[in-house]
Amino acid sequence: MDLAVRKMTLEGLGVSQLGAVHENLPPARLVEASVRRREGMLAENGALVCLTGKRTGRSPKDRFIVENGLTRGPVDWGPVNKPFPGERFERLLAKASAYLENLEEVYVVDAYAGADPRYRLNVQVVCEYAWQALFTRQLFRRPSREELDAFEPDWTVISVPGLLTDPEEDGTESETFVGIDFGRRVVLICGTRYAGEIKKSIFSVLNFVLPTEHGVFPMHCSANVGPGGDVALFFGLSGTGKTTLSSDPERYLIGDDEHGWSDEGIFNFEGGCYAKCIDLSREKEPQIYDAIRFGAVLENVVVDRITRRVDYSDASLTENTRAAYPLEYIEGAVDSGRAGHPAAVLFLTADAFGVLPPISVLSPEQAAYYFLSGYTAKLAGTEADMEADVEATFSACFGAPFLPLPATTYAAMLSEKLREHGSRCYLINTGWSGGPYGVGERVDIAATRQMVRAVIAGNIDESKTYTDPFFGLQVPLEVPGVPSGILNPRETWADRAAYDDQAAKLADLFRENFKKFEDGVPEGVRKAGPNV
């Protein structure tokens, strides 16, 4: 970016008189700076290991959207999208500016959010920490040198983990603050080193801008494409297997977390992956394992300080250990980040109750119902301040924490896309079988991969099915390469009466949760849920 443009954009946010500003450094120099500044250390595999302190996940209670004329009407205000007064945000921004001006060094990354030039955002990220600049460089899409010369930011993200907010003085919930101002086009992140806040804040921005300004459907999903051009989408919350299942050596990865679906096809918002790596092994997830090398960031992963060997099984810091790396580290990843319309759409859920079938075929109405329901399990450590190890939860559209607009807006966009392009839809349970969490076992990843391959190949559509008596789902009687005994969840429980009781309880939870959507959906969708 031209220095005059940089100066003008930052001064427009009240930021001036900075110390040394390091712009768009390559990974090696950012790693070097991180080690020099003692922000992290190198592991034996070459990755940079950084710790985030007590905030080892997102801080949803501390996320706000500035209420103004642009957001007052369309935003779905509530516990997820909490309003924040513009004048208070101005004061916090001034605090952040003063804080930045007192730092000896600041790291700035210019990047794209969105692989399709028609819809992408130019994002300028200003970081207190060099390792967060490395994270940003590897996770966002990287402009060429020529593009950087002409780069002008649409949005600015300011990440100052060392600035702790004061609830009494600043009107925040805690010392942490994540605020989005759609008027000034700025994101302010204070009091947390968890780097996922940077990427998810811009995801929230895209989830507002793309539907309202471009008619593009934003999705919390991973995506891959086969040699024949057949595209598959994988929806699901953190820990349900989006990254794992879309990283298939027989297919080409488009992206692991955030995509848009336009009239021309799908496109990745990002240029990298942010994979959970608790219990990671080369045997189970070879692509992810091999992508963790020099230039990658390991977040809250335990490392032996003497040997520098990584222990992916150690959850003493958090279950939410993460690896951030660029897509180019995945062999066969789609460089363009773009592909055609999806043939198969998969909803992933980690069912903590252990009662949902491992695979179900969804009608268009059921697709809308289960998309709006967004049922999964909130696994330990994917958010800060969690009280239970596992908590069953409903997160609309498999991404409620990141959706500024009403959930029914996104569901209507999905239904329209499925109708227009004839995409098939499935529900995949990557959670528990044979009992609830703590009693049953997690569905084997190898079996889940076989189910996914059968779905993509179209083999499921030719299989005979039975109707699940509790949820009305069509469940295949057989799937190639998968033991038929696990396809009927009731048969995997030693105590069938206990299964019936647990299934009825979950069905009740679905019905209770869906009441808030009933007035905003067609009758067919209202009737597509559990039938007991």
Swiss-Prot record:
Chain positions recorded as Mn(2+) binding sites: K200, H220, D257
GO CC entries: cytosol
Group of enzyme by EC: lyase
Reactions that this protein is recorded to catalyse: oxaloacetate + ATP = phosphoenolpyruvate + ADP + CO2
One GO molecular-function entry: phosphoenolpyruvate carboxykinase (ATP) activity
Pfam families (UniProt xref): PEPCK_ATP (PF01293)
Chief location of this protein within or outside the cell: cytoplasm
Compartmental location: Cytoplasm
Any GO BP: gluconeogenesis
Pathway per the UniProt entry: Carbohydrate biosynthesis; gluconeogenesis
Cofactor(s) of this protein: Mn(2+)
Superkingdom of origin: Bacteria
Enzyme Commission no: 4.1.1.49
Residues reported to bind substrate: R58, Y194, K200, R322
Residues binding ATP, per UniProt: 200, 220, 236-244, 285, 322, 442-443, 448
Manner of cofactor binding, per the entry note: Binds 1 Mn(2+) ion per subunit.
Assigned keywords, A-Z: ATP-binding, Cytoplasm, Decarboxylase, Gluconeogenesis, Lyase, Manganese, Metal-binding, Nucleotide-binding
Function: Involved in the gluconeogenesis. Catalyzes the conversion of oxaloacetate (OAA) to phosphoenolpyruvate (PEP) through direct phosphoryl transfer between the nucleoside triphosphate and OAA.
NCBIfam families: pckA (TIGR00224), PRK09344.1-2 (NF006820), PRK09344.1-3 (NF006821)
Family membership noted in the UniProt record: Belongs to the phosphoenolpyruvate carboxykinase (ATP) family.
PANTHER family (UniProt xref): PHOSPHOENOLPYRUVATE CARBOXYKINASE (ATP), PHOSPHOENOLPYRUVATE CARBOXYKINASE ATP
Protein name: Phosphoenolpyruvate carboxykinase (ATP)
Gene name for this UniProt entry: pckA
